[in-house]
A protein has these predicted regions:
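Hydrophobic transmembrane-helix bundles of small-molecule transporters
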Residues: 46-150, 157, 183
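12-transmembrane solute porter fold
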Residues: 29, 48, 110, 130-300, ...
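Transmembrane alpha-helical segments of integral membrane proteins
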Residues: 68-71, 299-304
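Helix-loop-helix hairpins in multi-pass membrane proteins, especially solute transporters
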Residues: 1-87, 265
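Membrane-interfacial helix-loop-helix junctions in multi-pass membrane proteins
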Residues: 102-106, 308-315
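A residue-level signal for alpha-helical anchor/packing sites in multi-pass solute transporters
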Residues: 9, 13, 43, 71, ...
């Protein structure tokens, strides 16, 4: 709910010429949390036990709630009075559930059921004047649809990198989990630094240009990841992670800016929710692709020294697929057109 509404509120509050900067700061804050979360969680777990993680998270939640109640005085219910689409919401939730579970478990019946529900959902939503998901918007707004596709491809190509590199650093390089975590933090740290800058730039340059450049940098980093082996220096791994973080930062804020700037004010909530949906589905697809590659190449086995070579080969295949997805994402990003006259 937070991810689905935060960008909509920011877009409603800030004028178009400052929208990218605001979204960039928000994105940078998200990535800062991603950087500090694993480190803070590790410190808390090691010193105070795993329950302390949930206690501290609850405290942060209450603090955020207090800040929102005190300082967020306005209201942005631009679609107030419209009927809520309960039927469409139920179909939508069921569709995502079956698709994500089907791809995660490689269950053909669940995948087919998810696809059938997707077709029903599109047909049903296309008939409504007040749908939960603006299918007509996707079909009629090229900038919105291609920007959403670019986001989906970017998340699908990058989310599982942290998972693969965590295993690589622990199994192949022999680091403990805490050290591997410190190394992996280099990616979101770079993202936190450059996301606000990219958002600011997208207020002055067409977002599609900035986002496409970011997609290109991300593609390059994934190609470099596809070249790793057991002898790759850790310094190279850190450099690849930082390059990936820079590419994602350069893409994310401008792409979100393009999505939010391509729709009318009354669709801000739907557009923001679409960004969150693309993130969720893309991340799920990313992990599903990794699991599929490993399942087809080595099956369900424990990663022991005798399988280290196969693990590296599977990882390289996965990175190659991710690079291809990101490469196609460049064209989706470039094809969206201008958002400014």
């Amino acid at each position: 709910m937070i991810f689905a509404t935060a960008v909509a509120i920011l877009t409603s509050v800030f004028p178009p010429q400052e929208r990218g900067k605001a979204i960039g700061i928000n994105t940078g804050a998200v990535y800062t949390g991603l950087s500090l979360g694993p480190l803070g969680g590790g410190i808390l777990t090691q010193n105070l036990g795993w329950r302390s993680v949930f206690i501290v998270n609850g405290m942060f939640g209450f603090f955020a709630l207090a800040v929102a109640l005190i300082y967020l005085k306005g209201e942005w219910a631009d679609a107030k009075g419209e009927k809520f689409d309960y039927v469409g919401s139920t179909i939508y939730a069921s569709m995502l559930l079956f698709l994500i579970y089907g791809f995660s478990e490689f269950s053909l019946p669940f995948m087919l059921l998810g696809i059938i529900l997707a077709a029903i959902f599109v047909a049903y939503e296309n008939r409504l004047e007040q749908p939960v998901f603006a299918v007509k918007l996707l079909l009629s707004n090229l900038t919105f649809s291609l920007s959403s596709l670019a986001a989906l491809l970017n998340y699908a190509a990058t989310f599982a990198v942290g998972f693969l590199m965590s295993l690589y650093l622990q199994y192949i390089k022999g680091f403990d989990a805490q050290t591997a975590g410190f190394i992996l933090v280099s990616q979101p740290a770079v993202m936190a630094i450059f996301a606000p800058v990219a958002g600011w730039i997208s207020d002055r340059i067409e977002p599609r240009i900035v986002a496409s450049a970011g997609m290109g940098v991300t593609t390059l980093s994934l190609i470099l990841f596809a070249s790793i082996d057991s002898n790759t220096a850790v310094s190279n791994v850190i450099a690849y992670l930082m390059l990936l973080g820079f590419g994602i930062a350069l893409f994310s804020s401008p792409n979100t800016n393009a999505i939010m700037s391509s729709v009318e004010r009354k669709f801000f909530g739907i557009a923001s929710a679409t960004v969150a949906t693309m993130r969720l589905v893309g991340q799920s697809l990313s992990m599903a692709l990794v699991m599929l590659v490993f399942s087809l190449m080595i099956g369900r086995v424990n990663i022991t020294p005798e399988y280290y070579g196969e693990f590296i080969e599977c990882s390289r295949v996965a990175f190659t697929i991710f690079a291809a997805l990101c490469f196609f994402g460049i064209f989706a990003s470039l094809g969206r057109g201008k958002i400014r006259g």
